[in-house]
Amino acid sequence: MKKRTIATFLALTMAVSLFAGCGQEAAPAASGDAPESQAEAAPEGETYKLLFGHTLTEQDPFHQAYLNWAEGVKEASDGRLIIEVYPNSQLGVEEDVLEQMKQGTNVGWQTDAARLGNYVNEFSVLLAPYFLESLDEVKQLMDSPTIGAWEDELAEKHNIKVLSFAYVQGYRNVFSNKKATNPAEMKGMQIRTAGAPIWVSGVGSLGCTPVSLPYGETYNGIQTKVVDGCELPYIAANNLKIQEVAKYALETQHFYQNNFIVCSVEWFNSLPEDLQKILIDECDKAGLAISEQMEKDTAAAKQEMVDAGVEVVPYEEMDIDAFKAASEKAYEELDLLDARDAIFAELGR
């Protein structure tokens, strides 16, 4: 199904749901373009369905994690709750999907703290430069009362329910055709990033000039010299074949990125309590499993890029103290100092 067709289908689904109620099953996708879920629907009236989308390719490890989540939910719910997984932005652009979600449609999405920060500013701190440092810290924060309060505000004011933030991509580094080891040397470098304020401010604090481009245009942007490089985790960079268009991997490790899985509060509340628990538990389970696997796979992705000719400037050779000092500007610009202090207190830092 082409993106336009699926987006139109979702709009119609949303309109129908206003009359039929969000707890009912959405119309199935056209048989010629089924989503990547092996789940079979239970008898009508006993099944709930979530259409889950993301921007990544079918080859991305997270996509397989979402298929695992779908299968785990199907098995644990005896087929009463079905998740259909749509990669490659097939459900539409993120802004449109989140808007449909806010209206109560049975859609879910992979997003990040930067995007959620547009609704509740404090979320942005989770993607601020040199903030989180490890998967263990993410696990520790899964029961955070501070983040729980932010989630409550997001749900009450914007009808967006956080199911999990256990999907960790790890450290992001700069991939560029220019070599640099400190903020001064990065000055003037045009680096592709996402458009949310914390991305722009955080990447800008490294000394370079952030340029917002869609994820799918990253490779072409570097190839055509629209930008000098990008900032990504090793696995994502390798999947996009950035080694074909960038000479250097600068190990800034400026962001430690975890992603959020969200859905509509209205739709979530339409589920029986046992299905709500299954949905969340299986989401966390699949997220932690892929996060642990990606920690192991990062070294292999890095080596593949090195074998293709990328020169690595290792973390130990970067002036990290200078980068960290410069990153304070991002916290101040986005009013995140109090949020940082609250989370650091919970982490014992």
Q: What do the predicted segments below correspond to?
A:
Residues 1-5:
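Positively charged n-region of N-terminal signal peptides that target proteins for export
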Residues 7-14:
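Sec-dependent N-terminal signal peptides
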Residues 17-21:
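C-terminal motif of bacterial Sec signal peptides marking the signal peptidase cleavage site
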Residues 23-33, 42-137, 146, 153-349:
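N-terminal secretory/targeting leader peptides
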Residues 140:
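Short beta-strand-centered segments that line the small-molecule binding cleft or hinge
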